[in-house]
């Protein structure tokens, strides 16, 4: 699959600060929104400081990439959302209700995985987060749960939110004027920002 030079990114953010990891996932669709590519991710180990660790990465992405939206759990991310809104990115922030919409997100992720329409970056930490997650069938559909309570699954949850956003939203990516001195074009940009 060819990689776009200037992709539209759909972000999913699963926030935790004290005892659990925090994960940000970026995916991009193909031209027809039939397949999706895992463009990059950051997983922060606890304790996580949202203002000094997560916010700079989000601001860097919103400034230098075409971001269609950020799907996130509003319960833990109030400060992040307020700061991003103050910086003019409020229209790209989409709250995900953890009771109702996460079932939809899990169902969408399940469909893409079983239909082999999602390409993931080979990464041991990603593999671990996915292996520690399980899908539980409920009357509303699939729900993402932890197999072992002490193992993190935040990447899986963030991926599900990003996938849900990408499969629902089309044509919302905006982008400031491009400058080769200012903008980065690399699928590994998240690694360099998070370091």
Where are these regions (language model features)?
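Short, surface-exposed amphipathic charged segments that create phosphate/polyanion-binding patches used
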Residues: 105-115
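RNase H-like, metal-dependent nuclease domains and their acidic two-metal-ion catalytic environment used
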Residues: 1-96, 103, 107, 120-195
